[in-house]
Amino acid sequence: PDSNGARYYMNHQVWRPNHDKRGIGGDQVMMALSSWNLYYDYTGDESVLENMQYMADYYLAHSLSSSSCKWPDLPFPYNDSVEYGNYDGDMILGKGFLQPDKAGSFGFELVHLYKKTGNEKYLEAAIKIANTLAGKVQPGDNDHSPWPFKVNAETGEPGAIVDQEVWYEGMSKDIGKKRAIIKKSDYATNWTATLGLFDELIALQKGVSIAYRKAFEITLNWL
């Protein structure tokens, strides 16, 4: 275990004997769950299923945006204070920013885990993720995906880089003082798992199937 009691891979994206200071990768937990899901199906190794539950339980307990946020009940992809024990933001943009595509991936893996264990908490969390994403979906265009790549969970504003600087408090005032190049994080294409999340919940007849079907069609048409 790491210094906060969690297993090392729940805090870090790189293994180094002298203790790497970077937090986890944005899709790290979801990719591990996806791989373990396939491996468990192949081997039936119960220790693999136990590890899947450990990762999902820890991430659920330490990563979700508040239900009062504009983007509620979604996991933050990064632990800004690496060994503090919570995931609270984005590796580049900092605290408060999440990545909707990673949330969809996590929800998809939670459904797989629910189907393997029968544990309703995984299904309930997946439904909350799907509800938020379905409620936020937009048609998209050449410059905007149906959901932004990065968004501030509390304010609902997409993440932004100004003159190659990441967003910071007071940036809007600085923009007004100079000619600045602004690049918002409005575009991503990693939506396959999100489509899978909607598809799984529709098949299970859980959650709000009408909203999921609409979001599925909007996203598929955009892709």
Residue ranges and their predicted role:
Residues 1-223:
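Glycan-recognition and catalytic cores of secretory/periplasmic carbohydrate-active enzymes
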